[in-house]
Amino acid sequence: MRYFIIKSLMALTFVGANAAAQDHEYDLPIKEHIFENGLKLLVIERPGDNRVAAKIWTDMGALNEISGEYGAAHFLEHLMFKGTPTLGARDWETEKPLIDEINATEKAMIAELNRARNDIRERGVFHDYQHEKTTPEITRLQKHIDDLERKVEDLTVEGTTMKWYQGFGGTRLTASTEQEYMHFDIDLPANRVDIFLRIEADRMTNAIFRKFDAERMILVEQRIGFLNRLNSRYLEAMEALVGRTSNVYNPEGYMTDFKNYTRQYERYLYDTYFIPNNSTLIFVGGVTMDEMILKVEKYFGGLERKPEPTRYYGQEPLPSGEKRLIYRDNKLSPRVELRYQIPGVGHPDKPHFDVIKEVMQNRLQKNLDDKEIGGSVNVSTMVVHTNNYGLPSSIHFAAIYEDTEKLDASEEAMLAEIKLLSEENISDKELKFAQKTLRTQWYRAASDPNRLNFLIGHFEVMDSWKTLKPYLETRDKTTVEDVRRLVKQYFISDNRTIGKVIPRGAGQ
């Protein structure tokens, strides 16, 4: 059992303090307690607050998926909202045998799918040829599962968890799954935090995967909605080109993945990763560590420590050559984009790239405007849905135009500016402005219990919550020499992916 407190002298009321000061401290009075079963508890006490932002984080996400089942982690999040024997069940004694029969029938279906693997395998580039789309036995088993699911639906009550939370003043009931994490969260009156603990302890151990195929179709609808955005297919094509092996770059399921989801695989993910020694409870608000230790022990203390989950093995090969994408689309605005792989959180260089991102946003826009190339410049570290990872990801420099006339000139200008930054220092004024912008963003986030909770939890799953404060401090210590060094080291041709969007029929 360990117990830590990190404190600084600076309170959040100092948001307006002199940003030009050389030393900046960050108020992170985080207390940590680790229970015997490995469950971690983090608390920021805010005396006087009558509410608390509560989240439970699990170190599991899209990284842990296998090919052909991408999106399975996100799907598991949906299933874990479907209740337990005590939440959402109208008659559990009648429902349980039906659930058992569904699982047994699915097991038989998996065996039949495996037996018929050569018959039903997709053999066409354009998904247009299988010897057989199904077998009579697969059809029969699926119909039996559908019949059983309808019986189960008659025995369940939708939205039980939501009703509990709303009945006791809960707001912001959300959940999210990304590459490295899943979290469930709620904002509650501080004196109602037991509701959260009771529900989440139950969810961690007793989740029932109800309405499996109905939820599968919700993911299909979400995927269709995503693909209807003009830039979605382009972004996925770029991410697939930047990353060769890492699941960081994979989407939340291709359309071909959804049909492959099974209760058996979802149960494997659930049993493997949703365990006390792979989870962290975080509270920011009007609670104390002493009271939360007692409450968490009451609801989670009896849960058994399990074997450590399988770690993620994927690792990108060393950068070995420039890659290019020509993406043709008549609706998406023409653009040129440069992407470079950068290190993940926990690497000593990573905080400096936050500063570089801010510097480059202003510098590239000014440079293109001064050369009368113009365009709308966007500098980002967003990969799929997330800006930060504990693994290598990428930084992007994009310029968007109304037509293709200036794309080549824009690419040349951005490459020239990057080359210049590898040879000459930026101005001290540019550096200070970027650092001030980052501090302002941090203080705004830290003043919101929910956003602060997210940042602490995100760093915990990427590396450690203890990395957060040094990370922020390192950004303030970034020098012009650091910027030049990293541009020279990382922004090289062998580590570069270039994408261009042009209309169909344009170019070669």
Task: Please annotate each region the language model reported.
Residues 16-18:
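N-terminal signal peptide c-region/cleavage motif recognized by signal peptidases
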Residues 44, 49-65, 71-73, 89-202, ...:
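M16 family metallopeptidases and their MPP-like homologs
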Residues 78-88:
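Catalytic Zn2+-binding segment of zinc metalloproteases
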